[in-house]
Amino acid sequence: MSSLAILSWNIQFGLGVDGRVDLPRIAATCRALGDADVLCLQEVSIGFGELAPAAAGDQVAALAQLFPDHEPVFVPAVDRPGPGGRRRFGNLILSRAKVLDVVAHALPRPADPAVINMQRHALEATVAAGAGALRIVTTHLEFHSLAQRFAQTGRLASLEGEWTARGHAPSPEGKGPYGALPPVAGTVLCGDFNFPTDEASYAVLTGPAGGFVDAWPAIHGAAPHAPTCGVHDRHQWPQGAHARDFFFVSTALAPRLAGLAVDTRTDASDQQPLLLTVAVDGPASR
């Protein structure tokens, strides 16, 4: 049995605690953590120079050049006009494993006039994994609005229910876009969820109706989650070190979890990268 390594990181458009936007540093930090088959990066910018002048360029193209053996998958959550063309912001997947299918899911954004908020989505890429396939979903949930974040976790739980049901009762195979995919072993859901483990949104995903298992306790038992935020950047995160970035997996995948590591040393972003290893049947598919 081989394995698939998946990295998740909110790179904050490459902005480090030192105030520099440095995508080569992001790439080097990813490689230092491990040889990831799939990278799931949040807060990737095209044209949003107001975030930082160095974020005005095409970060998707730049990151794709830094990982030439990986296929880029980018569908923006935010897509706006700008003086130099479209401005886009969202989640990027870079996959060395063959990408079999891509779906972007717009997440709920109920009205919340009390706080600023933005459109969020979940980017789904089904990739070849051994003799079958694995569904990898990355997201970045709403930070300011608790109501929107709660609705978004509910939608993610609902999606997992749909995926599981389709796996148990597949449709007949057709031609062209109706063609079937290889059997999908389950879902890996990762990203910046913007909630702590004691928020109700966490229970929506990991409770009986959520369909997901938190990979950290599944691997590390009762050990506290390694902090993924506020480790180095106390200006943005005065509450200090805590976890808000997670890997969740389908219950069927829990026995296949082989490792989960967090790099708490890097300050190349305001948040920390995580690397999950999942066992897959047969040789790795690349």
Ranges and model annotations:
Residues 1-34, 38, 78-79, 83-286:
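Active-site regions of metal-assisted phosphoester/phosphodiester hydrolases
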Residues 70-78:
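A short acidic/basic microdomain associated with nuclease active sites
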Residues 16-20, 46-58:
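Short, flexible/disordered intra-domain loops and linkers
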